[in-house]
Amino acid sequence: MLILTRKVGETVLIGDDISITVLNIRGNQVKIGIEAPKDVTVHREEIYERIKLAAEDNNHV
C-alpha cells in the first residue's frame, strides 16, 4: 500500500486520467474529489460491498 500525505488542495494522480484531490479536512473526516472517466466506476467501499452481495444473491436464485 502506498501511503501519501496531502494538504487541502493537493492532488494525487492515478495513471493518466484519474485524479483525487483533498478538498477539506475537518476533525477526523477528509473530503475528497475524484475525477475519472465515465467508464470507471467509483464507489465507497461499503457501497461496493453491498453491490457485490446483491449481485451474488441474484446469481444464487
Swiss-Prot record:
**Where is it mostly found?**
cytoplasm
- Cellular component GO terms held in the UniProt record: cytosol
For the biological process aspect of GO, one term held by this record is: mRNA catabolic process
Which residue ranges run through the membrane? none
Q: Is Lipid biosynthesis tagged as a keyword?
A: no
GO MF, one annotated term: mRNA 5'-UTR binding
Per the UniProt record, one Pfam family is: CsrA
Q: Which UniProt keywords apply?
A: Activator, Cytoplasm, Repressor, RNA-binding, Translation regulation
Q: InterPro entries recorded for this chain?
A: CsrA, CsrA_sf
Q: Tell me where in or outside the cell this protein is found.
A: Cytoplasm
Organism domain of life? Bacteria
What does this gene product do? Answer: A key translational regulator that binds mRNA to regulate translation initiation and/or mRNA stability. Mediates global changes in gene expression, shifting from rapid growth to stress survival by linking envelope stress, the stringent response and the catabolite repression systems. Usually binds in the 5'-UTR; binding at or near the Shine-Dalgarno sequence prevents ribosome-binding, repressing translation, binding elsewhere in the 5'-UTR can activate translation and/or stabilize the mRNA. Its function is antagonized by small RNA(s).
Record-linked NCBIfam families: csrA, PRK01712.1
Listed under subunit, the entry gives: Homodimer; the beta-strands of each monomer intercalate to form a hydrophobic core, while the alpha-helices form wings that extend away from the core.
Protein family (similarity comment)? Belongs to the CsrA/RsmA family.
Q: What is this protein called?
A: Translational regulator CsrA
To which species is this protein native? Actinobacillus succinogenes (strain ATCC 55618 / DSM 22257 / CCUG 43843 / 130Z)
